[in-house]
Amino acid sequence: MKNLTSSELRKIYLDYYKSKGHAVISSASLIPENDPTVLFTTAGMHPLVPYLLGEKHPAGNRLTDVQICVRTGDIEEVGDPTHCTFFEMLGRWSLGDYFKEYAISCSYDFLLNHLEFDKDKFAVTVFKGDEDCPRDDESAEFWKKMGVPEDRIFFLPKENNWWGPAGVTGPCGPDTEMFIDTGKPKCSDECSPACDCGKYVEIGNDVFMQYFKNADGTFSPLKQKNVDEGMGLERMLCILNGYKSVYETDLFKPAIALIENLSGHKYDESETVTKAMRIIADHIRTSTFLIGDVKGIVPSNVDQGYILRRLIRRAVRFGRIIDLPERSLSKIAEQYISQYQDVYQYLLTNKDRIVLELDKEEIRFSNTLQQGLKEFEKVITHIPTKTISGKTAFRLYDTFGFPIEMTEELAHENGFEVDVQGYEDAFKEHQKKSQAGAEQKFHGGLADNSEETAKLHTATHLLHSALMKVLGGEARQRGSNITAERLRFDFGFDRAMTADEIKAVEDLVNEQIKKNIPVVCEEMTVDEAKAQGAIGIFDNKYGEKVKVYTIGDFSKEICGGPHANNTGDLKSFKITKEQSSSAGVRRIKAVIGQ
């Protein structure tokens, strides 16, 4: 195996697939563009779903990238040797071009000949088949053809070797996963990569999207067969360098060294200190990327902002355990900005914002943390049972800013449980008028591709342009959510709009609607789009060519669509509400055609 740095591994991977005819594309934002079902980009394939479904990608049908991702389902697991909330995914795709044989040959060649993994320790898994879809004998035969012996090819069920669909229906298919045998003894005669005994460590997988799952549960062959390869950068570095923990890699070492200096503690002096430093290093890396993202997430009590707040406050709590001085979190973020700025330049561009938001949130929570911890100690000392009531948990949240997950974590550390349902009931009762609402959370993007949502999508472009004309350039989009009934649009602005400003924005939009202006879509290079003054998230678009939607001389944005044919289709535009979304972000709700 090659001992590599993170920079070397990124370069080797992208250069390899570039040599195989793949276009290198940029990482997308951590906030999905048009997917209202999730908070974050959680996998390399996430931004490419439209192209996996058949839409032509501007860069072609062979792509490769390093996609930044956030997964927060296991926040409480962070602190062990392997879990991270932020990670980079090395990925490559074939969009209706090559399929299993060439994909497998590339994976084998890259892993064994370029990264120099031991051929004698290499093992793979393939789909064993079930009543819905046949056994993936094709992949098994191609692995044999590459020289993998039959006793190191394992057939496993859907729970191990199948991807998708993302929803009830959609593209899906078998995958083949690649492993290295660590040399540990078998846990049983049936020991395989499906075990969690640690004998086998995954180093990559290829997903073969060849089926479409229908609403009735049946599967049909896809017209366009796709390949999606994924290899986690952090995990791969850990394995290649023989580390026991991802926190030993060069992605975390500088931050942990800084935490040691700031706290006066050594990383390996105790399990408690090691865990605390891992949590702080992970959570501040993720927070740095979320705040620095082109969509600029800030701590709040809803959606992405809530996750960000939860990460920062968890880091503050564990910082107290290791005597981390106040305002240390922003210093750790500055270390990450310096470390990543050559790869993700926007972190340096947004450095001031990152430092400001981290300092603000750390100071805000530090002021109540100690009081809250004292109150928690009183609670567990005096309650007669081992369950903290929902009302008490809500009081800790409402008075001291303890996210429910923090209260649960503290409770479990002390042998208590929390009545989470009771907390949720108390929260709903208190938050009936919460801007997030009780029934629908704001995740951003389009709810569907109906004619009405297409019109409302066009309305968001008109609104975006009108806001910047009335309020200035700071009023850039921070997020959007569109259903068939209304649009919701978040934008950067540090105060409530006046009645005159709201009317001015409405008048500007309605003026464009009355003009019945055609909505024109063109494909062009990113440089051409920039030269024409198009609004876009230039650090996070794919390939050399992009779609640009133009509405006369009023609006020009890089966008994936869909849109109305002309502005007259909207009939009219009305702002129904203007309110705060979070610190420095305002939210508008609006309707059309009424």
PLM features per residue range, with description:
Residues 1-594:
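A glycine- and charged-residue-rich anion-binding loop/surface
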